[in-house]
Amino acid sequence: IGVGGLGDSQQAGYSLFELGMEIERLERTLEDRETQLEILGEIVLDREMESDLFVAGKPLKDGWIVSNFGQRPDPFTGKLAFHSGIDFTNGRPGSDINTVAAGVVVWSGPKSKYGLTVEVDHGKGFTTRYSHAEKLFVDVGEVVKKGQRIASVGSTGRSTGPHVHFEIYKNGRVVDPASYINRTDR
C-alpha cells in the first residue's frame, strides 16, 4: 500500500491557473538568462578576437634580430640604404615563421627581391609581411590565427642567408616593427 503522493493542486498551495502563471514567469526568466549568456559569450568572443587581431610579437619564437629597420649598409653593395623591416634568424633553415596577429592572407607567393612572401591583413589599417621563406603554408584568402605557422625560414629573393624579413604597414605606410615586438598595451 502506497502512502503520500502529490495530492491535488489546492493542497500544494497553487491553483492550476497560478501554476500556469508561475511556469510562464519561469520560462521568461529562463529566456532572459539565455539572452544574457549569449550576449556575454559574444563579448568574450569579441575580446578574444580583438586580442588575436592585436599586432604584437615576433615571427620566430626562438629567433633574434640580425638587422634593424632604417638606414644600414646594403649587404650586397656596401652603400647606405633604407631597410624597411627587421630581419630575424635562429640559424635553422626550415623553422616555422608564425603570424604576429590573426587576419586574412592577401599575398602568398614570390615577390621580386623579397622571394617567397606572405602578407596578412589584420584590419584597422595593419598589414604584415614575412619574406625570404623557403616554403609557404597558406593561400590568399585564408584566415590565419595569431601564432599560426604560415611559412618556413629560407633565403629566397635578395638574401644573404636564412632569415625572415618582417615588415609592418600601418595605413599603407611601412613602420618600424621594433615598437610592436614587445607591445602589450592596446
Which residues fall in each region the model found?
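Non-catalytic extracellular/periplasmic "stalk"
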Residues: 1-68
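Catalytic cores of peptidoglycan-degrading enzymes
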Residues: 58-186
